[in-house]
Each structure stands twice: as C-alpha cells, then as structure tokens.
UniProtKB/Swiss-Prot annotation:
GO terms for biological process: lens development in camera-type eye; visual perception. Residues 84-90 are annotated as: Connecting peptide. Keywords: Eye lens protein, Repeat. PROSITE patterns: CRYSTALLIN_BETA_GAMMA. This is Gamma-crystallin M1-1. Has a two-domain beta-structure, folded into four very similar Greek key motifs. GO terms for molecular function: structural constituent of eye lens. Crystallins are the dominant structural components of the vertebrate eye lens. InterPro entries: Beta/Gamma-Crystallin (IPR050252), Beta/gamma_crystallin (IPR001064), G_crystallin-like (IPR011024).
Length: 177
C-alpha cells in the first residue's frame, strides 16, 4: 500500500494531507504544495485535476523544497499511486527516429542516461513499450520534464503527453521504486 503526504509549506511544515490511493482532485485538501514525503510506493503527481497537466514521478523519499528540486510551481492537483508490482519481469522498449514506428529503430532492455550517446539523436518520434514501465526525461541524466510510459504503442510523441520529440534520457521504473 502506498502513502504520500503533501505539505503546504517547505520543510514539511504547515497544513498537510495524507493520501494512500489515487486522488483525482486534491484542491479541496490544500491550497499549495511546497514539500512532499513519500513513505511508501511510487507516485505520479499532476499539475491539474483528473490526472491532467504535466506529470511528475516521485519515489520513496523526502522532498523538502519540492518546487526547487522538481522545477514546479506549487500547483499539485491530482495524484496516482503506481502499481506495486511495476517492473516485475523483463523490461523492453523500442524507440524510433520517426513517427508511426518508422525509421531507425533501437531496442533497449536497460536504462539510458543519454539518448544522444546511444541513438545519435535528441529526438524520439515514436516508441513501443513491449514490457515494463518506463519514464522518459526531457534532458540527459534523468532531468527535466517526465513522462510515464505504460506497455503499448506510442505512434507519436504527443501520445505520451509531450509537446516535442526531445528525449534526453529514460529509465525503467523497476530501478527506482
């Protein structure tokens, strides 16, 4: 079972709200969020209600100044607990240089801290998650905007919620939960 605690002020101060399952609308529970403590599980949090807006992945740990470490404003409006058995088994991802799974393809079974070093491009236009859950990051070394990819085909970058094809790095969820 997961557990996440949201705090209105930095360093776990101010009014708090504890959550142990999906919550499509956090707005009635607090006005702003400036620190977060994840006691159990892995979570995706979103800037807007109903799991909309930009998602951010959080693993177990403390985030005393959430805005600074994640580059967010203080607007967290929904949260989703990721399945506790993510990443059990193998992980397999195919990335493509063009949309609709066309062009050069590379298959990955492991994390990739720098897409350009492995794929000779800063852009991934489509992909196919064959097994496991993966997180795409906008920048190398697992930094910047994040996108959670579940098993399935993503014919274009907008399918995983991005506005651009820029992917700097990606990793398997198993290594971080």
């Amino acid at each position: 079972m997961g557990k996440i605690i949201f705090y209105e002020d930095r360093n776990f101060q101010g009014r708090s709200y504890e959550c142990s399952n999906d919550n499509p609308d956090l707005q009635p529970n607090f006005n702003a969020c400036n620190s977060v403590r994840v006691e159990n599980g892995c979570w995706m949090i979103y800037e807007r209600p109903n799991y909309m807006g930009h998602p951010y992945f959080l693993k177990r740990g403390e985030y005393p100044d959430y805005q600074q470490c994640q580059g967010l404003n203080d607007s967290i409006r929904s949260s989703r607990l990721l399945s506790q058995n993510l990443g059990i088994g193998t992980n397999k991802l195919r990335v493509y240089e063009r949309g609709d799974s066309k062009g050069e393809m590379m298959e990955f079974l492991e994390d990739c801290p720098n897409v350009y070093d492995r794929f000779c491009s800063h852009e991934i236009h489509s992909c196919n998650v064959l097994d496991g859950y993966w997180i795409f990051y906008e920048l190398p070394n697992y930094k910047g905007k994040q996108y959670l990819l579940r098993p399935g085909e993503y014919k274009r970058f907008t399918d995983w919620g991005s506005q651009t094809a820029k992917v700097g790095s990606f990793r398997r969820v198993i290594d971080i939960c």
